[in-house]
Amino acid sequence: MTISQLGRPGLFFLIAAFTSTILVACGDQQDAEKKVDEGVSPLSNQATPSNTSPDGVYWGDLHIHSRLSMDSFSFGNRMLSADDAFKFAKGEPIEAHTGDIAQLKKPLDFLLVSDHAEFLGVIASIIDRKHGIDETELGKRWKGWFEENNIQAILDEWVGTLDEASSPVGAEAQNIEYPPASFFNEVWRDMVDMAERHNDPGKFTAFSGYEWTSMIDGDNLHRVVIFRDGPEKTSGVVPVSSIESSDPEYLWARLEDYEQKTGGQVLALPHNSNLSEGRMFSETRISGAMVDTAYANTRIRWEPVLEMTQVKGDSETHPLVSPEDDF
C-alpha cells in the first residue's frame, strides 16, 4: 500500500492503531509464555490476519514548535515559521536562525507543527507589532522586557500562567491579561491554512494540531492534539488552552465537542510523561477522585497512543521498574 492510499485519514489510523497493536501482541506473548511455564500447552489461534489494515512504515514528526510558541521564540527562534518547518520536512533547504542552511537527506512522510496553545502567537505578534497586542499592558510589559533582553522575565510569567508552583512570579501570573478570542481565532486559521497548503496527498501529509500545555506543581501533563481533518472542519475551532483548565478530562470533553459538532476526528498524544513525576499515570484524578473504569475508557478513547521517546527523555520505563536497564 502506498502513501497515496493513506493521506490524513490513513496516517491518522496508523498513529492510533500502532501502539495498541504492539501492546496486544506483547500481552498475548506474555500470556502464552506463562502458560508454557505452567506446563499447559497454549491454544493455537486460528484467526486469519486481515489484509485490510495499512502495512507501510512512514516517518514523520508530531512535536515541533515554530516562532508562534512562547518557548521557541524566547529561546532564539525569531523567524522560523510553520511554513519553514513544512518545507524542511518535505526536503527543501531552509536558512536556520544561525544563518546556516539546513536540509534533510531524505524527506519526511508527515509533519505536525504543534505550537503551544497557551499565548499562541502572542510574543511574535508583540515584537512584529501586529494585531494591536503590542499596545496592551501585557504587550508593553513583554516588549519592554524583550528590548532589555530580559527573556527570563517573559518566560517566568508565561510559565506562571500554566502553573504558579513552578514559576518565580507564582500566583501573580494567574491574573495576567489574556488576548481576546478573536486574536487566537485568526492565528489558528492561519495555522490550519498553512498545513492545508503543504498537504500533498500521495506525497506528504501535513496535520493540523497544537500542544495543550498543562502543568501541576511543576509536573508535566502535556498533550499533543492531532486532527485528522482539513480546514473545512478544523478552522471552526480554536486550540484548547490549559489556562482554561489544567485537567485532561476538560480537554477530552472539548475534543468530544469537536467531533460531535463537526463529524471530524481528533486524538491526544501524551507528551513527555517522563517529566510528570508519575502524575501522567496517577491512580487519582485531578479532581481527587480515584480512577475508575469509566475514566479509563474515556482516556483510551481520546489517548490511544503514548509518546515513547524523544530528545527530552524516554517514557517507556522508570529506574524503579527496570533497575538493571543500562539505558
Predicted feature descriptions by range:
Residues 26-327:
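Extended, charged catalytic domains and RNA/DNA-binding interfaces, predominantly
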Residues 1-8:
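N-terminal secretory signal peptides that target proteins for export/translocation
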